[in-house]
């Protein structure tokens, strides 16, 4: 392999020092692709196909350099020439192939599959504009297309192409591959992304609006196109079928190339269905097998023995149910198969709760996955128990052997080695590099003798990361941040169950408290980051309130020195890699029972933030690992919440009437906020909280404020706080996605 200088010299006939950052980025892109191209693809007989609507992979340059073992030498060569890798990275556009935790998990998982030397590819779609680019203007979210595709990128066009049949036409796909090199492995896997050459961005008008009926030109333009109308729902079905039909044809082709006669397909392939978006892969595989001469009974048996389903939510809205008539309109050739699968279920089980097609002729995708797959897993211990005992109990009673838990994880290469090199290098220095391959070795931090030196170093690393974030936000948004403040951070997609509205009510509490003369020991900066779906009005209203409070506080000289609210624009993986290492307080405040797992909680913990959270998702396992004294838990537990729902016993108006709560909620529609906000938005949110509050914000609000105030007080005892930080970092090893993927392989995939 050439040195970077030799590669640059050959490409530009210049030295590194003479090149612009743009030239160096393109050189490094191609240098990394060359290094990766020299690694063979994993070729084990059996392969996992991880099918997902999202892969939130983030910028790939540094991540790939780390995995290829080139990062340190490249960084040194650049530094010797007076160049900074972090500045060159700014040139790279972040791939817009995902939105939230689902897509980020998929990205961590394909990294770990490759790093463990397992044979497995991600399969998805190549969205041209992703979800959207968020612009914050007039205290509101606006949306524009997020253009990220360029002539030179990580995508490599392959020669594979498939015919995908719809009711009235057939589309021809193009397959693009992105290499996924494992961490210092001799081999690699790939992310396989299907696209259409006919897609045309000129049909986009006015933000992210476009003709939803022009399938040949719109199919892969956007992730999750607005489905608030019939055409939007149909487009989602077109997208999902395009993804799974291509994926299924790829699976069959690759198995045949390895010697399969298709009767033994399950010996060659396992399909992991990531949430319900890829569920049509089940009837599509059955269709393709029967077309190739396999009897229907055998085809069903084969598919049942090679598909596994990961459930990511108990929110009914997210468990997809498509009207049968929509499927008849888009994929009529799948409908007889789905009806036959449903007929077999109804012949055996009379309970309507487990039927695939319900009495309203809606097709329940998760039900099909459970009946016609061999594994169903939740993504955190609590989540899996809720599935077994509540949400999917009717299925658990039938198939207890199918249900298993696989607590989510994160790749430490992205979220520690890349995002927080200062901490990563310090851990190498005092613990050695063993944790790179076995994250449980971080526990050695607990027995490291010179605790005082560790605490001093952790303080300086956190201060460095706060300055780094402040510089980044100054460049990106022009916002000035006090780096001596406590950094309190909530970054995740906007949804009522994640309760950004509760954090906003805390901000109001703190604002009024400071106005009353109660000055905090040091300044507090509250960061929010996340996008709201364009059709999700209340989520947009929550963003509006946050931005209004930011303005009210900034314009109040009595409060501004002590409190600041920052909404990070267009939150993405890049922003997260600046925010997470700088964080003191990690906000994980979903209503108990609603967050399947969460992975932000793990990233913050690994980077030395303390969790403020409910007993929900993976917070439960974090609490078990670190102990009650090293996490800040508030709010009602999941059993209480589930019981309140079951009895319709929660009345938000009763909580609103409380002395500690009413002034905070009323402030949403106060003159101060209305002066900078939109009356319609603020009143709608206010009425939602006092009359409905489906995700029980007011139920937990008082306890949330109390525990957060305790946390702020505890922060002032730096010695005790840093003891807690050390425990959190040391215990984070369990949440490595390498551990999660090893468990998927051992219990579900059986690749080796």
Residue positions per predicted region:
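A conserved ligand/cofactor-binding region detector
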Residues: 1-752
């Amino acid at each position: 392999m050439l040195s970077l200088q030799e590669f640059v010299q050959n490409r530009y006939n210049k030295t590194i020092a003479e090149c612009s950052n743009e030239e160096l980025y393109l050189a490094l892109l191609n240098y990394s692709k060359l290094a990766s191209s020299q690694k063979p693809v994993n070729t084990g007989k059996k392969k996992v196909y991880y099918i997902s609507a999202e892969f939130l992979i983030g910028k790939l340059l540094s991540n790939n350099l780390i995995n290829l073992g080139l990062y340190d030498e490249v960084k040194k060569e650049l530094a010797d020439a007076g160049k900074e890798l972090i500045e060159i990275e700014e040139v790279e556009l972040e791939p817009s192939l995902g939105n939230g935790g689902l897509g980020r998990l998929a990205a961590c998982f394909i990294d770990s599959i490759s790093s463990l030397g397992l044979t497995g590819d991600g399969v998805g779609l190549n969205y041209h504009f992703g979800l959207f680019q968020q612009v914050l203007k007039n205290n509101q979210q606006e949306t524009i297309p997020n253009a990220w595709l360029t002539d030179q990128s990580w995508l490599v066009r392959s020669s594979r192409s498939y015919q995908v049949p719809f009711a009235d036409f057939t589309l021809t796909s193009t397959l693009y591959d992105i290499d996924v090199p494992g961490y210092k492995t001799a081999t690699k896997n790939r992310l396989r992304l299907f696209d259409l050459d006919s897609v045309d961005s000129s049909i986009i008008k006015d933000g992210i609006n476009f003709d939803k009926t022009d399938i040949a030109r719109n199919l892969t333009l956007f992730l999750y196109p607005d489905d608030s109308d019939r055409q939007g729902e149909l487009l989602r079905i077109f997208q999902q079928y395009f993804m799974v039909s291509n994926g299924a044809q790829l699976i069959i082709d690759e198995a045949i190339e390895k010697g399969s006669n298709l009767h033994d397909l399950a010996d060659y392939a396992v399909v992991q269905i990531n949430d319900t978006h890829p569920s049509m892969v089940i009837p599509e595989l059955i269709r393709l097998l029967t077309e190739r001469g396999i009897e229907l009974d055998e085809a069903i048996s084969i598919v049942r023995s090679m598909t596994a389903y990961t459930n990511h939510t108990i929110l009914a809205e997210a468990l997809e149910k498509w009207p049968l008539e929509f499927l008849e309109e888009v994929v009529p050739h799948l409908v007889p198969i789905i009806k036959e699968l449903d007929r077999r279920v109804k012949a055996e089980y009379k309970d309507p709760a487990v039927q695939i097609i319900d009495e309203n002729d809606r097709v329940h995708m998760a039900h099909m996955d459970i009946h016609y797959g061999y594994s169903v897993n939740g993504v955190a211990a609590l989540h899996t128990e809720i599935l077994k005992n509540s949400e999917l109990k009717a299925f658990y009673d039938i198939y207890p052997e199918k249900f298993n838990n696989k607590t989510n994880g994160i790749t430490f290469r992205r979220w520690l080695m890349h995002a927080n090199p200062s901490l990563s290098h310090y851990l190498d220095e005092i613990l050695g590099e063993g944790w790179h391959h076995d994250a449980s070795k971080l526990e050695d931090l607990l027995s490291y003798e010179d605790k005082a030196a560790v605490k001093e170093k952790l303080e300086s690393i956190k201060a460095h990361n706060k300055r780094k974030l402040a510089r980044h936000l100054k460049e990106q948004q022009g916002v000035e941040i006090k780096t001596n403040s406590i950094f309190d951070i909530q970054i995740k997609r906007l949804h009522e169950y994640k309760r950004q509205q509760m954090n906003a009510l805390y901000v109001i509490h703190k604002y009024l408290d400071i106005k009353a003369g109660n000055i905090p020991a040091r300044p507090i900066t509250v960061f929010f980051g996340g996008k709201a779906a364009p059709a999700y009005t209340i989520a947009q209203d929550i963003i509006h309130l946050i931005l209004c409070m930011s303005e009210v506080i900034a314009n109040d000289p009595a409060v501004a020195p002590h409190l600041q609210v920052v909404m990070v624009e267009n939150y993405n993986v890049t922003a997260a890699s600046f925010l997470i290492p700088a964080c003191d307080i990690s906000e994980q405040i979903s209503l108990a029972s609603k967050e399947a797992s969460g992975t932000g909680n793990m990233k913050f913990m690994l980077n030395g933030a303390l969790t403020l959270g409910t007993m929900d998702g993976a917070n439960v396992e974090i609490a078990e690992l670190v102990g009650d004294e090293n996490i800040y838990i508030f709010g009602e537990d999941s059993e209480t919440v589930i019981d309140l729902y079951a009895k319709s016993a929660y009345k938000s108006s009763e909580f609103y009437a409380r002395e500690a709560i009413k002034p905070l909620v009323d402030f949403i529609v106060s003159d101060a906020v209305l002066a900078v906000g939109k009356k319609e938005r603020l009143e709608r949110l206010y009425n939602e909280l006092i009359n409905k509050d489906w995700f029980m914000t007011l139920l937990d609000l008082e306890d949330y404020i109390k525990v957060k105030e305790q946390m702020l007080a505890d922060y002032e005892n730096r010695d005790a706080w840093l003891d807690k930080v050390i425990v959190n970092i040391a215990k984070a090893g369990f949440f490595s996605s390498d551990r999660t993927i090893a468990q998927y392989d051992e219990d579900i995939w059986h690749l080796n």
